[in-house]
């Protein structure tokens, strides 16, 4: 496997050739003073040698297997690192979340992987399917990565996705709930420089991958939506040039030259509620082609279920991620209102 990766420099190909597991982990050094460790299928770590590094960056993709643009973006970066085209100055862990689902061309095989973090994999039915086992392993790999160095570290986790439906804001990020911790203006402007100028502040703990890293390691973590889902090879990768350039600068320790925080350059939303499915007959009143961030006025009936109506409570609420087909008990939609900068630092 080492020789295969050394020759091809294509970690995605190695991962897809062994979607369930690798028979062994391995490590090696590149000629440009970079140490590489492969921990599992879809799990590869790069660490610069001989330099003082202060940042730990996790880049995850394919938590949903059919969200291909982030997979291609991460594979480009991994190939550049393996080909010694980049001079790495900070530690990076790449995670290809759900390789079997990539093969299958679906979001998941048995269960939505991004509902299984922060210990959810072992609750209820326990480790009863491959996604639950994978969620536990991914948590362990993040812990291993973030725990490897002590002292003052800047930890980041960007979990990259694409959305099922079209959006009024093509690229947007979900900033996980942080309790009493402030939200980072610097991180928001980093994302703005990546072409992601719309931020959703979550209102409660969740079981997503980004919340896991934020809550347990105080990482600056985000779920980042980079556009709409397309099949592998059909993504217009020019739409991700800014993201790739900023991630490259970050990994290579270059000056980021971020603009000052400016509300005029941003769209900030506060999640005001998450609507969970209670009955099998749940249905939205709007059509399937309604875009993310479509706004509805107070009193508008968003959905019906079990003889009840779900109505808009604020003057206006925008919706994201509507999905009536989830199992009972899971989220069907997030409702948003405008946010200000009162909780930003």
From Swiss-Prot:
Gene Ontology BP annotations: arginine catabolic process to glutamate; arginine catabolic process to succinate
The UniProt note on the cofactor reads as follows:
Binds 1 zinc ion per subunit.
- List keywords of the entry alphabetically: Arginine metabolism, Hydrolase, Metal-binding, Zinc
Keyword GTP-binding tagged: no
Which Pfam families does the record associate with it? AstE_AspA_cat, AstE_AspA_hybrid
Family, per entry: Belongs to the AspA/AstE family. Succinylglutamate desuccinylase subfamily.
* Catalysed transformations (reactions): N-succinyl-L-glutamate + H2O = L-glutamate + succinate
**Protein name, please?**
Succinylglutamate desuccinylase
Q: Which residues bind Zn(2+)?
A: 64, 67, 161
Pathway info: Amino-acid degradation; L-arginine degradation via AST pathway; L-glutamate and succinate from L-arginine: step 5/5
Taxonomic classification: Bacteria, Pseudomonadati, Pseudomonadota, Gammaproteobacteria, Alteromonadales
Active-site residues from the entry: 225
- The organism is Shewanella pealeana (strain ATCC 700345 / ANG-SQ1)
Q: Which residues form a coiled coil?
A: none
Q: Which NCBIfam families match?
A: arg_catab_astE, PRK05324.1
**Cofactor(s) for this UniProt protein:** Zn(2+)
Gene Ontology MF terms: hydrolase activity, acting on ester bonds; succinylglutamate desuccinylase activity; zinc ion binding
EC identifiers of the protein: 3.5.1.96
Q: What does this protein do?
A: Transforms N(2)-succinylglutamate into succinate and glutamate.
PANTHER family from the entry? ASPARTOACYLASE, SUCCINYLGLUTAMATE DESUCCINYLASE
Q: Which domain of life is it from?
A: Bacteria
Q: Does the entry feature the keyword Zinc, yes or no?
A: yes
């Amino acid at each position: 496997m080492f020789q295969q990766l050394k020759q091809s420099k294509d970690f995605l190909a190695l991962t897809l050739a062994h979607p369930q597991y690798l028979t062994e982990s391995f490590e090696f050094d590149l000629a440009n003073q970079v140490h590489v460790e492969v921990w599992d299928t879809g799990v590869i770590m790069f660490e610069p040698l001989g330099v003082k590094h202060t940042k730990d960056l996790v880049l995850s993709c394919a938590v949903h297997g059919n969200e291909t643009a982030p997979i291609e973006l991460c594979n480009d970066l991994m190939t550049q690192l393996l080909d010694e085209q980049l001079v790495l100055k900070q530690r990076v862990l790449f995670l290809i979340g759900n390789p079997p689902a990539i093969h299958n061309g679906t979001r998941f095989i048995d269960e939505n992987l991004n509902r299984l973090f922060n210990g959810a994999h072992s609750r209820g039915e326990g480790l009863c399917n491959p996604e639950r086992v994978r969620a536990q392993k991914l948590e362990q790999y993040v812990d291993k990565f973030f725990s490897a160095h002590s002292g003052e570290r800047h930890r980041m986790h960007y979990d990259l996705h694409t959305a099922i439906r079209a959006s009024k804001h093509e690229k947007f990020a979900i900033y996980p709930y942080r309790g009493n911790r402030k939200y980072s203006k610097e991180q928001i402007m980093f994302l703005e420089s990546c072409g992601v100028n719309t931020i959703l502040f979550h209102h409660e703990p969740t079981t997503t991958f980004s919340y896991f890293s934020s809550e347990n390691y105080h990482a600056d973590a985000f779920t980042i939506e980079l556009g709409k889902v397309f099949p592998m090879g059909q993504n217009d990768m020019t739409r991700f040039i800014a993201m790739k350039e900023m991630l490259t600068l970050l990994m290579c320790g270059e000056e980021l030259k971020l603009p000052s925080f400016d509300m005029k350059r941003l769209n900030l939303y506060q999640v005001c509620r998450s609507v969970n499915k209670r009955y099998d007959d749940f249905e939205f009143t709007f059509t399937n082609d309604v875009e993310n961030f479509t706004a509805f006025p107070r009193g508008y009936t968003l959905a019906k279920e079990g003889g009840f109506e779900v109505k808009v409570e604020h003057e206006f609420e925008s919706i994201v991620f509507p999905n009536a087909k989830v199992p009972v008990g899971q989220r069907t939609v997030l409702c948003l209102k405008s946010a200000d900068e009162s909780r930003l630092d």
